[in-house]
Amino acid sequence: MALAAVKWAISSRTMLKHLFPVENGALYCVGHKSTYSSLPDDYNCKVELALTSDARTIVCYHPSVDIPYEHTKPIPRPDPVHNNEETHDLVLKTRLEEKSEHLEQGPMIEQLSKMFFTTKHRWYPRGQYHRRRRKLNPPKDR
């Protein structure tokens, strides 16, 4: 198995040397396309292949091609007045309405007072009168 892998590596290296001839210098660019390409012919890039001088690395250069303005299309913008589709605001409003229906505080406070054997007043928030009288910066202990 290992012998077959070594033979394949050697044969692929010699094959690459024949496909991409190396001249003096570190890199030689080949101007022709390879016979096999997974990209369609009208794809917007020019592919150039190169092989380094030590024949260990294949370099692929594919800059994107500029597309003429005549071949582009504008982004469709729907009319906001006559658009019947759901907008982001409508979706948020419906979600908030659904959440507010589930948050009823009446039975929740009664259930809490029965569970912990307390009065209902314990579970309501403290009023502004009590919050105002609380010291904001209590003195530190010595």
Curated annotation (Swiss-Prot):
InterPro entries per the UniProt record, alphabetical: Ribosomal_mL42 (IPR019346)
Assembly, in brief, is: Component of the mitochondrial ribosome large subunit (39S) which comprises a 16S rRNA and about 50 distinct proteins. Component of the mitochondrial ribosome small subunit (28S) which comprises a 12S rRNA and about 30 distinct proteins.
Please indicate if the UniProt record lists Transport as a keyword: no
What's an example GO cellular component term for this entry? mitochondrial large ribosomal subunit
Query: Any idea which UniProt keywords this protein has?
Result: Mitochondrion, Ribonucleoprotein, Ribosomal protein, Transit peptide
Residue span of the annotated presequence:
1-32
The primary gene name is: MRPL42
Does the keyword Transit peptide belong to this entry?
yes
| Protein localization | Mitochondrion
Q: Which organism is it from?
A: Bos taurus
Instruction: Write out the similarity annotation.
Output: Belongs to the mitochondrion-specific ribosomal protein mL42 family.
Q: What is this protein called?
A: Large ribosomal subunit protein mL42
Among the Pfam families in the record, one is MRP-S32
